[in-house]
């Protein structure tokens, strides 16, 4: 098993301490062992719903699903996949808001294992550190690649950046469509869900929060 980076461990510990870590157990098997286990069980599931796995269109589906679960859509359950973050000292004394708007987010509803599709905006006021802008996208993607509920995902992203940047002054805004609502149950194709999380000056100062919300809605 690969080792978890110090940055990833700090973030994981912060989430556990606050009680907002995704419910999960320790990974004791290798990726290949987990892929094989999922493949075998997905084969059973597909047969139980009546699919013919001798058909050439379906016979490799259990293999594809196992790879997708481990290497792609649920890769954020494994902290060895946490993005490498290099904190850059804020020598330029940047003091204005840094905002990355409309980060594409694709996650999976943990209740029905169908898609959550949306956009995320992340802002912070630098203190000691800044980070590369693409790292914001990568951290968002890491936490999205898990079975999720949107409210917890929003809080996880907030706390992750507060931990990495060593500042409370972070804001997160998320707008997403839930396919568990769109393609099953009520089958509402029009609604979306908005969540937000604020820390530091974004929480305490109404004008700062207002500025953030006006910028992301331009």
Curated annotation (Swiss-Prot):
Zn(2+) binds at residues 109, 112, 180. It catalyses: GTP + H2O = 7,8-dihydroneopterin 3'-triphosphate + formate + H(+). It is an enzyme of class 3 (hydrolase). GO terms for cellular component: cytoplasm. It comes from the Bacteria. It holds the Pfam family GTP_cyclohydroI. Keywords: GTP-binding, Hydrolase, Metal-binding, Nucleotide-binding, One-carbon metabolism, Zinc. Its EC number is 3.5.4.16. Pathway: Cofactor biosynthesis; 7,8-dihydroneopterin triphosphate biosynthesis; 7,8-dihydroneopterin triphosphate from GTP: step 1/1. GO terms for biological process: one-carbon metabolic process; tetrahydrobiopterin biosynthetic process; tetrahydrofolate biosynthetic process. PROSITE patterns: GTP_CYCLOHYDROL_1_1 (PS00859), GTP_CYCLOHYDROL_1_2 (PS00860). One of its GO terms (molecular function) is zinc ion binding. Toroid-shaped homodecamer, composed of two pentamers of five dimers. Belongs to the GTP cyclohydrolase I family. This is GTP cyclohydrolase 1. It comes from Mannheimia succiniciproducens (strain KCTC 0769BP / MBEL55E). The lineage of its organism: Bacteria, Pseudomonadati, Pseudomonadota, Gammaproteobacteria, Pasteurellales.
